[in-house]
Design a protein with these regions (language model features):
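Acidic catalytic/metal-coordinating carboxylates
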Residues: 43, 70-73
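Acidic, metal-coordinating helix/loop segments flanking the phosphotransfer/catalytic sites
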Residues: 40-59, 63
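Structural signature of beta-strand start/N-cap positions in the alpha/beta core
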Residues: 13, 37, 56-58, 86
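Two-component signal transduction core modules
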Residues: 60, 110-111
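Non-catalytic signal-transmission and effector/linker regions of two-component phosphorelay proteins
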Residues: 1-15, 19-21, 25-28, 76, ...
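The feature encodes the CheY-like receiver
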Residues: 66-67
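Hydrophobic/aromatic residues positioned on beta-strands within the core alpha/beta folds
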Residues: 90-91
């Protein structure tokens, strides 16, 4: 087996779905610095394809703004096929938390935007097998 493949196999795999390129870059840079393998999708179809194409997806981080499907619909679609997929939902601070929570599965936490690198790490940490995040 190629050494790069072994390294990737050992690293937590995270898919980030958001149409805002600056948010995606911030999340990817932050989580890659912590040793995670981070993949991005700017639309819902790509996010679904990524989650299914990886032999293991440790976490999906999605936003309300994902081209194609709204982020909540993306989460429900993925959960039908991957019921155990851990998901973290990024939401703009303007959204009503109770209204949003009612639409999400109960085990999907909300990371309120804007957030810092440390807030992102704290939100990701419970989902990553070896505590990276």
């Amino acid at each position: 087996m190629h050494s790069a493949t072994r390294v990737l196999d050992d690293r937590p795999r995270i898919v980030v779905a958001d149409e805002d390129h600056s948010v995606v870059q911030f999340v990817m840079q932050t989580l890659r610095k912590d040793g995670n393998a981070v993949f991005h999708a700017y639309d819902s179809l790509s996010a679904v394809q990524l989650a299914f194409s990886l032999d293991r997806c440790d976490l999906l981080i999605s936003n309300t703004r994902v081209e194609g499907l709204p982020g909540i619909d993306l989460i429900h679609q993925l959960r039908r096929k991957l019921p155990d997929l851990p998901i973290l939902y990024m939401a703009n601070i303007g959204r009503s938390t109770p209204e949003l929570e009612a639409q999400l599965p109960s085990d999907v936490p909300i990371l309120r935007e804007p957030f810092t690198a440390e807030e992102l790490r704290a939100a990701v940490r419970p989902f990553i097998p070896d505590g990276r995040g």
